[in-house]
Amino acid sequence: MGSLKIVVLKRALHAIEKTTEWYQINLNLTAANHFKEGIYHTIEVLSRMPSIGRKDESMKGNHTYYSFLAHPKYRIVYRYTDSTLYIVAIRATMMSY
């Protein structure tokens, strides 16, 4: 199987940009680049093997959604068809108190 076409929805793209910006402001440019490169590398892997994620029961709708840990603190939420991988959201996995 080849790679699926990748579509990053606006909501997910915004989350990637805002999180990268946070890393740059609060840590440094190296950390920001490492985060962003890690997310996009994981998206590339998912485009070749979309079934490696687990079903994400928190997402409701007409589609089956999956999530995959892309970074120690973030999951990629996605769905896919025979030809396209849709990146739906980037979700923080940190526990809130």
Where are these predicted regions, by residue range?
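A short hydrophobic/aromatic micro-motif that marks alpha-helical segments and, especially, helix-coil
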Residues: I43-E44, V88
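Arg/Lys-rich, positively charged N-terminal/basic patches that mediate binding to nucleic acids
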Residues: M1-G38
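Residue-level signal for beta-strand positions within conserved beta-sheet cores that form or flank
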Residues: G2, T64, S83-Y86
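Generic alpha-helical hydrophobic packing signal
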Residues: V7, P50, Y66, T81-S83
